[in-house]
Amino acid sequence: MASSTGLTVAGALLAGDFRLPAVSSLIPRKTSSSLSCLSNRDLSSPYNCCWRLSRGKILTSLSNSRKFAVGKEAEDGFLSNVSEDTDEMFDDLFNKYGKVVFRSTDVKSPTAEVDDDAESLAFAVELAKVASDVKAGDIKVLFVKPLVYWTRFFIIATAFSRPQIDAIGSRMRDLAEKKYGKVANGDVKPNSWTLLDFGDVVIHLFLPPQRTFYNLEDFYGNAMQIELPFEDQSQPRN
């Protein structure tokens, strides 16, 4: 996130903002603040609860400033009241502004977000086609952006041997690097669960027992499944 933030009332957010598919539950994010967001938790990315500073950071910041007190006794006396003063300050802000959110300086417009989603979707579908060409089974592309903050799409597919996983991964890496200039992070050698992370698209390649055991489709059950344009996908072998 960019370091500079600006406060704005949630009700004054851009009208007509791109709305993602509604979900019944979201994976919670851990925040460092002693205060929690208000009851409405459906603030779309990149908006998050504004109270991100921990009390420890507030105390450290204030104690390092010489504008407030001079000398050890004055500083100690000041710090003893910081906790109470900080809580009162936050209470006053909530009473005055209600639901407050922050925007980073690099927030994209709704149109730009839609364009990025479309580009990522095209990339994901092309990678899924690679898996299909190498005879992977039960290929699914899930739009997980509303559920996680670190990627837009999952590709989940079943392979039936480690050499097949290696072949799928190699062809995906080649396509991504040559056509899109992207290099994957993640597993280099094929595993029973092999992960390739291209940033906006994350691929999960499973052997059948691990696909059944981890059942990512159920774990991310609120994600929208993308209809793939190619047909005749291989089915998992018994």
From Swiss-Prot:
Compartments in which it is found: Plastid, Chloroplast
Domain of life according to the entry: Eukaryota
Keywords: Chloroplast, Plastid, Transit peptide
Signal peptide extent: none
InterPro entries: Iojap/RsfS/C7orf30, NT_sf
Main location, first listed in the record: plastid
A GO cellular component entry from the record: chloroplast
Transit peptide: 1-66
Assembly description: Interacts with chloroplast ribosomal protein uL14c (rpl14).
Role summary: May be a ribosome silencing factor (Potential). Involved in plastid biogenesis.
Family: Belongs to the Iojap/RsfS family.
Protein name (record): Protein Iojap, chloroplastic
